[in-house]
């Protein structure tokens, strides 16, 4: 039964505006119960094998080039071959699953209207890569110093800064809190020190050399420093801030190593061997060994 007059009221109130909720749905934020595992996939694994093969081929090529020249002019060839040999061994280890560990980190995610959350990450780290650099990059710096006639004092500072740079980078990689950026600052300072010793002092040492030799040193040293600049960039983007995947990191490091340890080695040796002036000639112990001529033996008696 309809109350008299109610039907007329319903007709007029049906078109009146109604209130709507002013507060939207509160987002649901669920803390990460399981850690996010960041590891290498097929792209990264194939990259490791490709670089290992390239470094093996380059090592054979460099040893062959070394055998074709006199021992007095073979020092650069030997150092370059050792660089690719160490790189081959390190990439072979990584390709077969050796020299790897996982870094555990916890990332804090702040929120405005709900409690903050934390997410655990497990990222695959190839520590043998740092061992590769600690051995090979001083040899690269020695090649640059020999090519440009850099003195021993400047070379020693450059090598020390190089070792500090990679040791600080390794420490920053496994540091869990904001202190990793302190170690990263040490990486930057070390890189600038290398750039000054090799770039500025090296340019001064070849200022009076022939144009061909000066051009070879300037371009070779400059190209190496430019590629070395990728190290702090990739380091910040991959293990420190985890902005890129492990596969992308692997490809980036592969490009870095192929250039500095492989292609630049061909550039150095071919440019050095074709140069009419400024070829490195090392005699003495390197080519002749220790001479015993004129040595006096103390303590021996005549007729003994």
What are these regions (language model features)?
Residues 1-41, 298:
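Fungal extracellular Ser/Thr-rich, low-complexity intrinsically disordered regions
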Residues 30-44, 112-128, 247, 252:
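Juxtamembrane membrane-interface segments at transmembrane-helix boundaries in membrane proteins
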Residues 61-65, 115-174:
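Internal transmembrane alpha-helix with an interfacial aromatic "cap," most often the third helix
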Residues 219-304:
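C-terminal transmembrane-bundle signature of multipass membrane proteins
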Residues 44-69, 88-91, 95:
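First transmembrane helix
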Residues 90-125:
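Helix-loop junctions on the outward
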Residues 181-184, 202-226, 246-250:
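Membrane-helix boundary/juxtamembrane motif in polytopic membrane proteins
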């Amino acid at each position: 039964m309809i109350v008299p007059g109610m039907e007329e009221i319903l007709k007029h109130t049906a078109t009146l505006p109604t209130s709507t909720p002013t507060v939207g749905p509160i987002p649901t934020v669920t803390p990460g119960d399981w850690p996010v595992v960041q590891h290498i996939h097929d792209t990264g694994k194939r990259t490791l094998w490709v670089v290992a093969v390239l470094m093996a081929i380059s090592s054979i090529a460099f040893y062959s080039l070394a055998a074709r020249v006199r021992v007095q002019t073979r020092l650069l060839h030997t150092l370059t071959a050792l660089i690719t040999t160490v790189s081959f061994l390190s990439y072979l280890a990584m390709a077969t699953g050796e020299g790897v560990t996982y870094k555990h980190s916890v990332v804090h995610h702040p929120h405005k209207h709900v409690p903050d959350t934390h997410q655990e990450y497990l990222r695959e780290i190839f520590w043998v890569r740092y061992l590769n650099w600690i051995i090979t990059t001083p040899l690269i710096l020695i090649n640059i110093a020999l090519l440009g006639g850099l003195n021993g004092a400047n070379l020693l500072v450059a090598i020390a800064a190089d070792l500090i740079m990679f040791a600080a980078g390794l420490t920053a990689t496994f540091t869990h809190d904001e202190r990793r950026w302190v170690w990263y600052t040490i990486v930057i300072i070390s890189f600038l020190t290398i750039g000054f010793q090799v770039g500025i002092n090296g340019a001064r040492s070849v200022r009076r050399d022939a144009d061909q030799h000066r051009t070879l040193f300037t371009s070779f040293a400059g190209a190496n420093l430019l590629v070395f600049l990728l190290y702090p960039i990739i380091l910040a983007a991959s293990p420190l801030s985890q902005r890129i995947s492990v596969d992308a990191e692997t490809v980036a490091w592969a490009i870095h190593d192929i250039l500095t340890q492989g292609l630049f080695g061909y550039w150095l040796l071919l440019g050095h061997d074709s140069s009419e002036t400024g070829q490195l000639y090392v005699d003495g112990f390197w080519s002749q060994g220790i001479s015993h001529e004129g040595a006096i033996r103390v303590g021996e008696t005549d007729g003994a």
